[in-house]
Amino acid sequence: MDVNITLFFNDMNKKVKLAIPVINSGKVIGQTAFGTDTLFDDGQEVISHRFTAVKSGEKYVAVLDKSRYGGHFEDGTLYLSLVRGTTYCAHPIEDRMLIPDDRYTKKMDQGEHNYFFRLSVCDEIELDRKANEFNRKPYAVNVFPLGEMDAEKDFTVSVSNKNISLVTMKKSDKRDGYILRLINNYKDSQEAQITVGAATETVVFTKYEVKTLFYDGKLHQLDLMEI
């Protein structure tokens, strides 16, 4: 279920959160940079990226998002931080006045804000893929070929395991070919066949492992420092 929120915020010194009650709640997890982390469930503010999920029975109740990062979990309810109407740079230093009291001072996050969420019930192994599908919508590139060069042969890119994410595919900065970066954002090992054109490589990922491949007509595994 997709949830779109338009918020007009003109308050001061207030925080607005979206509350999502979860029945039979258990462990709370969230996406981090190239991984998944267990989050606090005692009311402390936490950070997560494209998904935050709460275990409920054998499944996870997941909130996929592309517009906010903070929140907390407390008493069976997930709270997602939306706006915070505080004063920018009002840090107390001895007896110095925090903000001038003879004029209007605008607060942070005031104005119109738009948020886009997707609520899903799924297995843990599906979280990263579903978050990518929600965040990375297909797009078109406006290209005007001049017709002065012969077109290269088309080739396709595929990953046999749908829970292995292709994070990056780019031209190499150092050699003639392409860099592919893939991640297994799950606690168990995974295996996948990576196909680029006519080249195929079987790759085994340990838990939360990132792999780098290089394509120059053939596929080669490299270390993460390759750009």
Describe these PLM feature segments.
Residues 1-227:
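Terminal accessory/anchoring regions of large secretory-pathway or extracellular enzymes
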